[in-house]
Amino acid sequence: MTERIGKIQTIKGLIEKDELGITHMHEHIFINYLDYFEKPNEQELKMCCLGGGSGSGNSNSNKTIEDLSNEKISLINNHWVQYNYNKNLHNLQLNEMEIAIRELEMFKRNGGSTIVEVTTKGIGRDPLQCLKVSQELNINIVMGAGYYLDKSISQFVQSMTEKQMEDEIVKQCLIGIDDTSIKAGIIGEVGCSFPLTNNEKKSLIASAKAQQRTGLSISIHPGRSQTAPLEIIQILKDSGADLSRVIIGHIDRTIHDINILLETAKTGCILEFDLFGMEISHYPFGGEVGMPSDNQRIEWIYQLIKHGYGENIVISHDIYTKHRLVSYGGHGYSHILFNIIPRMKKFGYSDTDINNILINNPKRLLTIIK
């Protein structure tokens, strides 16, 4: 165990922390999000049927709801999929090796070094496929341990005790994920609904206990309420978690009040703005607040830095659907590096601010401490 201390666990093995480089702390390379599919309705079908006009031969007015659900992303349905990304089955799976390599090669070409792949139990985690990507491109991939939302894990954990869940998380970190020898380098993303379910509370407590045994950070998927992060933080604190190594993800779709952001930051946890590039006027999964623009994200982070929380911030894209990949008309894994960092500099971010967000904070969080 002592050989792990001070190093970072990647999919290919332990690396020195200075090998990490520019890091996106919350991404998915392979994922199956079909549990969260919602069937389109008749009104949406009418909106998506593009008539070709008399004699054009291009009319798709006979399209059915099943067609709309199953058809591949194209120029014709691209906007509808962006607006209703949970209603197209093709969109809800990242499962194409060739495209994964192409997309992440672009990330590497733009200066990226490390992807934290936080797909966990219940949503199609695939360490062997991720290993192939890492080997092909020579980029670092850090895998996640633990359990996602109750909807995806109840079949696995309903009869498990907190201790059994804790032991399984530790096994994924110290021995290997599933039937592989590939070890996780972070706990999470740990799925939390709002309100929390009993299984999710067990998962949180198990994750806190596993952190004490592995020396890893915890990455949280909070429920969609501005009060959810503080409730989760309290449960983790009561269970012995090191809050300075707890990352509250999806902050940008969860808290839009600067005072609540500051209250959350005061706990010592890490605030993760991980939905850069997702700028939609309609957020299918709802919640108390909508989806902000990248400009809003940049402004909120800047305010947090000015309040002294520059070492408590990490960023990412959380790509988990095809429509956000460049191959399907989206922004891809390089959006932050190619578009956002220049905008941050124009906004007034210093080089130190940016290096902390992209390199130093991830390095500290991913370094194993026991």
UniProtKB/Swiss-Prot annotation:
Catalytic reaction list: N-acetyltaurine + H2O = taurine + acetate
Superkingdom field: Eukaryota
Entry keyword Cytoplasm: yes
Gene3D superfamilies: Metal-dependent hydrolases (3.20.20.140)
Claim: Hydrolase is one of the keywords in the record: yes
Subcellular location as annotated: Cytoplasm, Cytosol
Cofactor descriptive note: Binds 2 divalent metal cations per subunit.
PANTHER family: PHOSPHOTRIESTERASE-RELATED, PHOSPHOTRIESTERASE-RELATED PROTEIN
Name assigned to this protein: N-acetyltaurine hydrolase
Source organism: Dictyostelium discoideum (Social amoeba)
Gene name per UniProt: pter
